[in-house]
């Protein structure tokens, strides 16, 4: 793909350029990303089906709790993370001069770092919540307690999301630098991302908002099917009614989830392109700053 990466761009310019890149090269994008997108769609369908099946675990007609859907869900979640690294490498490979093998290896490495960082943040947040709960162990659980726990949880989630933003720059810098070392340069990459956090936060907010809005439209058939399943289950549990769903409902649900997820992955391609150009803009500003400092030193 022909791209003009290193250039000073505003958020709106990054979005517009990403739109143009995807629109002009849509066929090439599909060709380069269809396999990981399909695998993610299948994995999402497995995860969705496991959640669907776990709803029966709460039915009084089933005497024992079925752990299989839960185990399947955990495996699917971990598999989805690995497939996302594969998908991300495939998207970057469209605009990178490096080999796909190198992009894939680096994508797995930076994804593993991000996952570890996320899990550490969640563990710290869980420990804080536990300390708050333990402080109320011998006290009545008033509405203020639930407000406090909810407020702390929300604040920690927002803090974690904010601290994850600089990784959007770090992952692009790492994959697009032919000789960059993650072990030696991770902190430097992250700090550069912090310095360009204004553009990255704006890109994160807009792409998240756009993804949510488009996702609600794309996943509407699946949402309707899930609502039908929930209504049927409520009738079974409260009124002892027989299930009114057709025998092919599970196949219909899985097929719908695979198709809608595959379509949604094209939205994810667009978000990667937005951060690609945001990275280019931050790099341009960083290089211009270095040149000004060098000129001043002379």
Predicted regions and their residues:
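Central hydrophobic cores of alpha-helical transmembrane segments in multi-pass inner-membrane proteins
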Residues: 12, 78-91
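Membrane-helix interface segments in multi-pass membrane proteins
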Residues: 43-80, 122-160, 215-265
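Cytosolic-side membrane-entry/anchor segment at the start of a transmembrane helix
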Residues: 19-33, 89-121
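Membrane-interface segments at loop-to-transmembrane junctions
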Residues: 63, 100-109, 185-197
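Nonpolar helix-loop interface/hinge motif
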Residues: 1-56, 157-235
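Hydrophobic alpha-helical transmembrane segments of integral membrane proteins
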Residues: 72-80, 109-133, 197-206, 210, ...
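Juxtamembrane transition segments at transmembrane-helix termini in multipass membrane proteins
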Residues: 5, 63, 87-100, 163-183, ...
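Hydrophobic alpha-helical transmembrane segments
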Residues: 15, 30-31, 74-75, 108, ...
């Amino acid at each position: 793909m022909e791209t003009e990466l290193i250039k000073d761009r505003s958020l709106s310019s990054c979005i517009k350029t990403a739109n143009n890149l995807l629109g002009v090269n849509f066929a090439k994008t599909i060709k380069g990303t269809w396999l990981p997108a399909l695998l993610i769609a299948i994995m999402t369908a497995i995860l969705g089906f496991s959640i669907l099946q776990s709803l029966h675990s709460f039915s009084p007609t089933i005497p024992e709790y079925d752990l299989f859907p839960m185990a399947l869900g955990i495996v699917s979640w971990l598999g989805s993370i690995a497939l996302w690294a594969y998908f991300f490498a495939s998207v970057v490979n469209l605009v990178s001069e490096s080999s796909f093998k190198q992009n894939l290896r680096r994508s797995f490495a930076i994804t593993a770092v991000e996952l570890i960082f996320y899990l550490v943040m969640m563990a710290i947040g869980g420990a804080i919540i536990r300390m708050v709960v333990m402080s109320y162990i011998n006290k009545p659980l008033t509405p203020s307690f639930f407000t406090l726990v909810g407020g702390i949880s929300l604040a920690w989630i927002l803090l974690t999301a904010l601290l994850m933003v600089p990784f959007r720059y770090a992952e692009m810098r790492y994959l697009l630098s032919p000789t960059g070392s993650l072990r030696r340069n991770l902190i430097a990459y992250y700090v550069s991302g912090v310095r360009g956090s204004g553009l990255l936060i704006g890109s994160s907010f807009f792409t998240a908002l756009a993804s949510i809005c488009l996702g609600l439209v794309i996943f509407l058939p699946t949402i309707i099917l899930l609502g039908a399943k929930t209504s049927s289950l409520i009738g079974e549990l409260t009124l002892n009614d027989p299930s009114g769903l057709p025998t092919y409902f599970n196949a219909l649900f899985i097929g719908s989830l695979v198709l809608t997820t595959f379509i949604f992955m094209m939205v994810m391609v667009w978000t990667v392109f937005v951060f690609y150009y945001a990275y280019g803009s931050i790099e341009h500003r960083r290089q211009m700053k270095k040149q000004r400092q060098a000129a001043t030193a002379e």
